[in-house]
């Protein structure tokens, strides 16, 4: 791995202070079934519902995602830190085994959908732009499933943290 320039390191350190929801992006199709943990996910518009995802161009998943053309963004709950670690490659668990360890269901076009996630957002890649080290994917959503409540999982200061959902007063 090459040495980072001071500005690159400063940027990475600054981004470590940006709390972000933890997601596992999954795909299935002719190029295979896979997934990756990602925090670079944000909404673009609700007309039509569209997300923006940023995936490192050196990631094996980048090629698979583009070839399959369909993705599911699984917004992880506070109970899913182990799932996040597996799909981030922090464990030695091989890809196919990762899907066997947790409650994955089949969604549109066979997309892996994590049961119990705070949200499952399934769609097709509508546009791709290459910017620096990353591919920016615009995902036009075709199916949206949302849990009514649950604790969130965020990544902050280079570690996972459970974010407690405010409880409604009785």
Curated annotation (Swiss-Prot):
Belongs to the non-flavoprotein flavin reductase family. HpaC subfamily. Keywords: Aromatic hydrocarbons catabolism, FAD, Flavoprotein, NAD, Oxidoreductase. It holds the Pfam family Flavin_Reduct. One of its GO terms (molecular function) is oxidoreductase activity, acting on NAD(P)H. PANTHER family: FLAVIN REDUCTASE, FMN REDUCTASE (NADH) RUTF. It catalyses: FADH2 + NAD(+) = FAD + NADH + 2 H(+). The gene is hpaC. Reductase component of the 4-hydroxyphenylacetate (HPA) 3-hydroxylase. Catalyzes the reduction of FAD by NADH. The reduced flavin is then transferred to the oxygenase component HpaB. Is also able to reduce FMN and riboflavin, but preferentially binds FAD. Has no activity with NADPH as the reductant. The keyword Glycosyltransferase does not apply. Pathway: Aromatic compound metabolism; 4-hydroxyphenylacetate degradation; pyruvate and succinate semialdehyde from 4-hydroxyphenylacetate: step 1/7. This is 4-hydroxyphenylacetate 3-monooxygenase reductase component. It comes from the Bacteria.
């Amino acid at each position: 791995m090459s040495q980072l320039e001071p500005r690159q390191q400063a940027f990475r350190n600054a981004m470590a202070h940006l709390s972000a929801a933890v997601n596992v992006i999954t795909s299935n199709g002719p190029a295979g079934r896979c997934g990756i943990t990602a925090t670079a996910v944000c909404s673009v518009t609700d007309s039509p519902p569209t997300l923006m995802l940023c995936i490192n161009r050196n990631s094996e998943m980048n090629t698979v995602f583009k070839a399959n053309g369909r993705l599911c963004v699984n917004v992880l709950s506070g109970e899913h830190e182990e799932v996040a670690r597996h799909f981030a490659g922090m464990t030695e668990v091989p890809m196919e085994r990762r899907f066997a360890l947790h409650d994955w269901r089949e969604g549109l076009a066979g997309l892996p959908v994590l049961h119990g996630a705070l949200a499952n957002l399934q769609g097709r890649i509508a546009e791709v732009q290459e910017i620096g080290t990353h591919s920016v994917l615009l995902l036009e959503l075709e199916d949206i499933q949302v849990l009514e409540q649950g604790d969130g999982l965020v990544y902050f200061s280079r570690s996972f943290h459970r974010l407690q959902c405010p409880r409604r007063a009785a």
